[in-house]
Design a protein with these regions (language model features):
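Exported/periplasmic ABC-transporter solute-binding proteins
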Residues: 1-120
Length: 120
């Protein structure tokens, strides 16, 4: 009956996928673009029947069932970035954390949270 997706990166990809499938008009009255929280919050309240967002946000949320990733071209990654505050009081520790986050050693930890590591 209804599909919810965010206004962020994953929601932009959903809207593009709907357009690529030529379903924009057909689904116009059935889609809800959320803001103000994860799609799963709205899904758990039954604001819509199907929710679409990044896997790491969808998994293990009470009141919802994670079904799986979208197929093929509909499953586009959302890029994440990291930065360092120039006035940081712990800049050495922050730089060490950033180096770890992009290291091969971090890959298994990231994958456990359904985040794909970068491919430098």
């Amino acid at each position: 009956e209804s599909i919810g997706y965010s206004r962020g990166c994953s929601g932009t990809h959903v809207a593009e996928g709907i357009a690529e499938l030529s379903l924009t008009q057909e689904l116009a009255n059935k889609t809800i673009r959320t803001e103000g929280g994860p799609v799963t919050d709205f899904l758990a309240r039954a604001d819509f029947e199907i929710g679409i967002q990044q896997t790491n946000i969808m998994v293990d949320v009470p009141g919802t069932d994670y079904v799986g990733p979208l197929p093929g071209f509909l499953n586009k990654p959302c890029q994440s970035n990291v930065g360092l505050l120039t006035a940081s009081k712990e800049s050495d520790a922050a730089r060490a954390m950033i180096r770890f986050m992009v290291s091969p050693e971090a890959a298994p930890l990231l994958r456990r949270t359904h985040v794909e590591p970068i491919n430098p």
